[in-house]
Amino acid sequence: MPNSIERALEGIVVCDFSWVGAGPIATSVLAQCGADVIKIESVKRPDTLRRGEPFKDGIGTGLDRSGYFAARNANKRDIALDMSHPRAREVAVRLIEKSDIVINNFRVGQMEKWKLGWEDVQKINPRAIYVTMSMQGIDGPHSRYMGYGVNLNALCGLTARAGFPGQAPFGTGTNYTDHVMVPTHTLFGIMAALLEREATGRGQTVSLSQLESAICMTPSAPMAFAANGEALGPQGYGDPEAAPHGVYTTLGYRKWIAIAVFDDAQWATLRRVMGNPPWAEDERFATIEMRRRHAAELDERIEGWTATQYGDWLMEALLKAGVAAGEVRDAREAIEDEHLRRRGFWAYLDHPEVGVTLYNRAPIVFSRTPVEMKSAAPSIGQHTREVLGGMLGYSHGEIEDLAAQQVLV
């Protein structure tokens, strides 16, 4: 790693075979921290998110109008490489020789088919850190099974907890595992491996099981079963340690507020904000244990009050008093949030096809090294000639020969 750097990962090169959600989110963070992330795709097998809604102006023709893809692939360079072509491997090998990190989230065995598994990469570049983010890890009886976020939500136990008591689980509405835990754990692994390489000069495998990462989202469920044999089911908005704890109606069109009270001092504060109504003196609500026991009755009382208040005023009043509260917001309100704007969370980048587009940066801020959104998501092959002719040392004639043989598509 260089001694004098503008951004934290300046000089780090990433050979990025990842696609869809978890992998591209992780490599996007690396790119925003300064790494040169080179995404490998082919028009024959593009990242499937290129066809994922929402599309700019609702027009989904082509492969460059997906906001979903754009959000996960800003700051990257992209080369077109048909890995099914016999000559594609030689290009990939040259890139791996220059790379610090080689990452994929394919099903186990795919990289080996291209002779680019860990054993191969280790011979090509002993300093390379080889990152694999398969569904259930690289070994074990289920290692070769495929899956997506919705399957992980189910397998890890998250779906079983989503919903309300007495009803069938109804899912989470989004693939939390793809968006949060899997890329986060992957990034921890990458940074630890980079640090260890500083001492040894050698790369290693960072093998992540997306299922195991996802299980870390619901630690209370396996612990409850291990402790007392209880299989936890849907719990709605409730929390075993808090009351009130839920989402309540407020004044206005489709408005709600989330309120959480974890101890008796917070309850006393909430009572003051409510104006100390007589019902709050009920002995059923005197302690946190009693409030949990009578949560349904308490929620009904709380909502009777919140329904007479405007959510924005109520959130500010509760937060200033010391009660955790959050107004339920939609995407427009999040984009217009003054706090997020001042922190520079949102960035606008100009894309050659869809024009100026909104992106969110990685949710970290360093005191010295910037985390930046510099370039919009790339088109397939946008940087092929730039990377091959510059970084990889191919001559103009060699690039033309590869193009003529349909390797660079």
From Swiss-Prot:
Enzyme Commission number(s) from the entry: 2.8.3.15
Domain of life per record: Bacteria
Active site feature: 178 (nucleophile)
Pathway the protein takes part in: Xenobiotic degradation; toluene degradation
Role noted for this protein: Catalyzes the reversible conversion of (R)-2-benzylsuccinate to (R)-2-benzylsuccinyl-CoA. Inactive with (S)-benzylsuccinate.
Family classification: Belongs to the CoA-transferase III family.
Protein name: Succinyl-CoA:(R)-benzylsuccinate CoA-transferase subunit BbsF
Lineage: Bacteria, Pseudomonadati, Pseudomonadota, Betaproteobacteria, Rhodocyclales
